[in-house]
């Protein structure tokens, strides 16, 4: 394992974390929108 390999792995891990974070944020927003629609219907 060279330093370049470790650096590449670090970048990939960061990208995966960002993708996971954006997925979580998007799903949270969708849940909030669904709740708003339900409360508006009542």
From Swiss-Prot:
Keyword Nucleus: yes
Superkingdom to which the source organism belongs: Eukaryota
GO biological process: cell cycle switching, mitotic to meiotic cell cycle; mating type determination; negative regulation of conjugation with zygote; positive regulation of meiotic cell cycle; positive regulation of transcription by RNA polymerase II; regulation of cell cycle switching, mitotic to meiotic cell cycle
Compartments (UniProt record): Cytoplasm; Nucleus
One Gene Ontology term, aspect cellular component: Pi Mi complex
Keyword set includes Zinc: no
Keyword set, alphabetical order: Cytoplasm, Nucleus
Note: There are three genetic loci for mating type genes in S.pombe, mat1, mat2-P and mat3-M. Cell type is determined by the alternate allele present in mat1, either P (plus) in a h+ or M (minus) in a h- cell. Mat2-P and mat3-M serve as donor of information that is transposed to mat1 during a switch of mating type.
Role this protein plays: Mating type proteins are sequence specific DNA-binding proteins that act as master switches in yeast differentiation by controlling gene expression in a cell type-specific fashion. Required for meiosis, but plays no role in conjugation.
Protein name: Mating-type M-specific polypeptide Mi
Organism expressing this protein natively: Schizosaccharomyces pombe (strain 972 / ATCC 24843)
